[in-house]
Amino acid sequence: MTVNNAVAKRISNLLLERNMSQYRLEQESGIQHGSMQCIMNGRNKTVTLSTVIMLARGFDISLTEFLDDEIFCSEDLETEQ
């Protein structure tokens, strides 16, 4: 699994946990709909740290909380080049 796929999966899990819509996350985070679609559909080759910070703020959690998930601890996690 790539880092980008892991971020998309983490977003999906948090949306479900918080009973939150993707639209609301876009509004709260300031991420454009098209950009969010690219992240969620795997068309985005690189998710920047700035984007992850915006996502965390959209969920009203810290960056540490966003990244504190076993999905990011996998030794099989790959980076895109």
Model-derived segments and spans:
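Short alpha-helical DNA-recognition segment
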Residues: 20-38
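The alpha-helix within a helix-turn-helix
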Residues: 15, 26, 56
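A short, Lys/Arg-rich alpha-helix, primarily the initiator
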Residues: 1-21
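Short, basic-rich loop-to-helix N-cap that marks the start of a DNA-contacting helix
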Residues: 43-57
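DNA major-groove recognition helix of helix-turn-helix
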Residues: 15, 40, 51, 67
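Residue-level detection of the helix-turn-helix DNA-binding "recognition helix"
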Residues: 16, 30, 41, 71
